[in-house]
Amino acid sequence: MKALIQRVTEAKVNINGLKEGSINKGLVIFIGFTNNDTFEKIEWVVQKIAKLRIFSDQEGKMNNSVEDIQGELLIISQFTLYASVKKGTRPSFIEAAEPVLAENLYNLSLIHI
């Protein structure tokens, strides 16, 4: 499992011109899965993200987690996090989980967040 995390003051996702999701202050999380991912790994990553102190406190220090600020999450499945361009000029996604498995892992990660 790979996660790419971005702090935001607001964010939204549009698909084919229709708003599918939006948040105010919080985190946008792009997550990708591989066939070797386990329940334990997902649980560990989810807990780590929830506890990361990446938001400023009143003194400007990064001392607060998304939980501390009661921030929101926008979670986007992103198989391209497992792209490889080691050979040739076309990305390979062999390391990415198959779509059905990835969807199940994505749903499992949502339950733990």
Where are each of the predicted segments found?
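Ordered, amphipathic secondary-structure segments that act as subunit-interaction surfaces
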Residues: K41-I42, V46-T89
